[in-house]
């Protein structure tokens, strides 16, 4: 199996999954609210978020695909580096297509197509200010972040076993406690410094939010997640019961 064949297989699987997702979202995120409006006397506008569910879907899809695809690709002669590239490129393609599809869907419902109902993307609108291409770029990067987290979590879950996995998870859980302790012990200057770092990372200024710092921050996290996933995937083995192949 070559790279193009593996990528085509992966993209077809993901696009089909995306179509299923949109079917469920149309039912629960669009149809149900519309039915509620028909039987309601309330004239307020009903808003359905289109960003968070898509981010969750992307992470879950990436997580689930790691194990099944790895076994299939290894058995068909692909190297671990090629498998990593297939996952990265397919996630990028799905993020690009998925973000565009959601934005088009939002545009359809943003006018007077259906009164008192709209699809929202408040998190993105804070930064993009209605700019379509900036919204597309930011949504794409957010989906890449979710996909990279799912990829890293999937590889970690398959690569690390037993006590090691528990220790790593506990260390991750301790990070907020550690940061909170540092902020308290450091006093007001430390808290202000940490707040300033956070504001810089998310692009908050006195005039409002700017998108470039946030894009850089998310891109860095995507790079870190992908780097860790590659390192974990480098010596990964196929597990059959308790045996390793």
Could you tell me what each predicted segment is?
Residues 1-19:
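Aromatic- and glycine-rich beta-strand/loop motifs that create alpha-glucan
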Residues 7, 66-92:
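Helix-loop-helix units of permease transmembrane domains in multi-pass membrane transporters
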Residues 16-37, 50-61, 167-180:
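Hydrophobic alpha-helical transmembrane segments of multi-pass membrane transport/permease proteins
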Residues 32-54, 90-160:
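Secretory targeting signals
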Residues 36, 104-138, 159-242:
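Terminal transmembrane helical anchor/hairpin motif
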Residues 56-68, 98, 142-149, 217-228:
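Hydrophobic cores of alpha-helical transmembrane segments in multi-pass inner/ER membrane proteins
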Residues 74, 78-82, 154-164:
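Membrane-interface helix-boundary motifs at transmembrane edges
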